Every structure is written in structure tokens, then in C-alpha cells.
């Protein structure tokens, strides 16, 4: 049976979604087979679906599904939450044929084979995820959620989901109910906070390279990183981490590891690229970045800035 990977996106987010999917396919072990499931706000045109399917030049995806989500979420939830976050909550109900599935945000570039994740025994745990580090405003935020251990707060952009157990405990309904309470109005990251509250104590920690968020890269945050992870984990993130653009988006301008996104974007078919306008300045910056001498100087300056910031922090 192919391994189910789920993504959610709107029609105006087809380009980032396609870029993420291409990175998943190109990084897969040749013996891996995936079932790619797209939860979309409205039906994609047949031509766009075909272009997306055409990304698989390696025969990695044995099945593609495009699920029209229009009308599946009560209108009361719109306006307060992103469409994608609401669709993600319904995954356990949408995929009754699977006991486990992997969900990814569409602002991630995958640089690892994902099939090994499906060999993890989740037991009675609900989720597998990457824990966020305690830095800055995160510290007070995580504590405000009244978790027994605030160091066990995961980023919900990359989730190994125990669908069988989630269905057993009616997790989707609990999520929707929580998001309609007064308490939820104080959540900084609504559905992510809800996942952490409801699944707390039933989460398996995944290696950080599976979901390398922005704060896993600058040296200024390394001390906080090492309170949760090891130096080997730090090296793995920087060598081959799945880059999650949790803040600045590379198609809009400069972002940490922005070139990784463009490495895949440039290989999309033109008919897909036309679905969204990307920043011309960001594209020019990428071309400079890839120029042997100029690019190396530019990268060296950014690294020096990062090092200087870290040194000043320690003084």
C-alpha cells in the first residue's frame, strides 16, 4: 500500500504546493511509493491536476487524489482560521482507509526520504511532530497554554498522524469544539495551539531535520536548540533539513535557506508557474546567489553577520 502524504492548499497557492510536492518526489528513495492527497478549497481544473501529476518523473507516486473541500467546514469557522488549517483537522475522517498519514504545510522544501516515518510505532500516541525551542515570546506563549511541560510544544506544519487513534477518541470533533470556545480567542496560533493542548502527553518527538523551522538556523538560537536536541541534530538540520519557511516566504523575497525553494521552483513547468506571480527581485537574488564568486561573497557576508550577532548576544 502506498504511503499517504496530505497537503492542503487553495487555488491561489498552487505554485508553493507544487514546489513542495516536487521536493517530496525528488527526495524520495527510489523504492518508495506515495499516495499524494491534496485537500483543495475548490476543484482544480483538469489541466492543473495533470500538470501536478506530471511532476512525478520518477514513478514515486502510485496514486493521486484531489479532494474538493468546499462545503465540508461549517461557515462559522471562516474568517477566524485559515482554510488549510481547518481542512487538516478533518484528515482522520477523510481517510478512513489509513491508520497513519503524514501531513505537510505547503511552505516546506523536503530534502529527505519520508518513508522511514511510517515505520514509527505511534502506539496510543496521537501525533509525531518536531518540538519548537523556547525562545523570546514563545516562552510566555507556551506557558500560557498551561501545558504540563511547555518544552513539548510542536510545530503543526509537519505531523505524523495516528489516524486510527484520532478516530477512536473523536479528535477532529474535539479540535473543532475547542476552536469555538472563549479560550481559543487567546491562541496565538489557533489550530497549532489546539493540537498541542489536546494531544499533550500523546506526542512522539521527531528529529528536528524533518521540520526545520526558521529558528533552527541562526547561531544566535543554537543554545536554545541544544536544550532540546543534540549537536548532531543541529548539524543534520543545516546539512539536509526539510526547510519550513515559517516566517518570510522565499517567493516574496529573501528568507533563510531561500535558495532551496528556488532550486525546485525553477523546474516547475511554465504552465504551473503562471498560476502565481513570484517576486522578480527574489528571482534576481537567487541568480546572484548561484553565481560562483559573487554568490559565495554574499553568503559569506550573511554568515559573518550571523556570527557577529551571536557574539554580541553573549557579551
Predicted feature descriptions by range:
Residues 9-15:
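Active-site beta-to-alpha loop of glycosyltransferases that engages the nucleotide-sugar donor
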Residues 45-94:
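Active-site-proximal specificity loops/subdomain of glycosyltransferases
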Residues 23-32:
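Short, acidic, metal-binding catalytic loop of nucleotide-sugar glycosyltransferases
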Residues 1-3, 8-9, 166-315:
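A glycosyltransferase accessory/donor-loop signature
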Residues 34-42, 129-130:
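Short internal beta-strands
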Residues 66, 70, 84-137, 160-161, ...:
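GT-A fold catalytic core of metal-dependent nucleotide-sugar glycosyltransferases
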Amino acid at each position: 500500500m502506498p504511503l499517504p502524504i496530505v497537503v492542503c492548499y487553495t487555488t491561489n497557492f498552487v505554485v508553493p504546493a507544487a514546489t513542495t510536492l516536487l521536493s517530496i518526489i525528488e527526495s524520495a528513495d527510489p523504492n518508495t511509493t506515495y499516495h499524494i492527497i491534496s485537500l483543495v478549497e475548490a476543484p482544480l481544473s483538469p489541466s492543473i491536476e495533470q500538470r501536478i501529476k506530471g511532476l512525478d518523473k520518477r514513478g514515486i507516486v502510485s496514486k493521486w487524489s484531489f479532494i474538493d473541500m468546499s462545503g465540508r467546514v461549517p461557515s462559522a469557522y471562516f474568517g477566524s482560521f485559515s482554510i488549510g488549517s481547518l481542512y487538516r483537522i478533518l484528515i482522520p475522517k477523510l481517510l478512513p482507509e489509513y491508520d497513519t498519514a503524514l501531513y505537510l504545510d505547503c511552505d516546506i522544501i523536503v530534502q529527505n526520504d519520508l518513508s522511514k516515518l511510517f515505520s514509527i510505532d505511534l502506539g496510543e500516541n496521537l501525533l509525531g511532530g518536531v518540538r519548537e525551542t523556547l525562545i523570546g515570546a514563545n516562552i510566555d506563549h507556551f506557558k500560557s497554554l498551561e501545558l504540563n511541560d511547555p518544552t513539548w510544544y510542536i510545530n503543526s506544519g509537519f505531523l505524523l498522524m495516528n489516524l486510527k487513534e484520532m478516530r477512536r477518541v473523536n479528535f477532529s470533533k474535539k479540535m473543532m469544539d475547542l476552536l469555538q470556545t472563549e479560550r481559543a480567542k487567546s491562541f496565538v496560533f489557533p489550530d497549532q495551539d489546539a493540537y498541542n493542548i489536546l494531544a499533550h502527553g500523546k506526542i512522539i518527538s521527531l528529529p528536528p531535520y524533518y521540520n526545520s523551522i526558521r529558528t533552527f538556523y541562526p547561531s544566535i538560537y543554537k543554545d536554545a536548540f541544544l536544550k532540546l536536541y543534540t549537536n548532531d541534530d543541529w548539524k543534520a538540520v543545516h546539512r539536509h533539513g526539510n526547510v519550513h519557511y515559517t516566517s518570510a516566504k522565499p517567493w516574496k523575497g529573501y528568507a533563510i535557506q531561500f535558495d532551496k525553494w528556488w532550486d525546485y521552483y525553477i523546474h516547475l513547468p511554465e504552465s504551473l508557474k503562471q498560476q502565481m506571480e513570484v517576486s522578480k527581485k527574489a528571482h534576481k537574488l537567487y541568480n546572484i546567489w548561484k553565481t560562483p564568486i559573487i554568490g559565495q561573497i554574499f553568503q559569506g557576508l550573511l554568515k559573518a553577520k550571523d556570527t557577529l550577532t551571536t557574539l554580541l548576544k553573549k557579551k
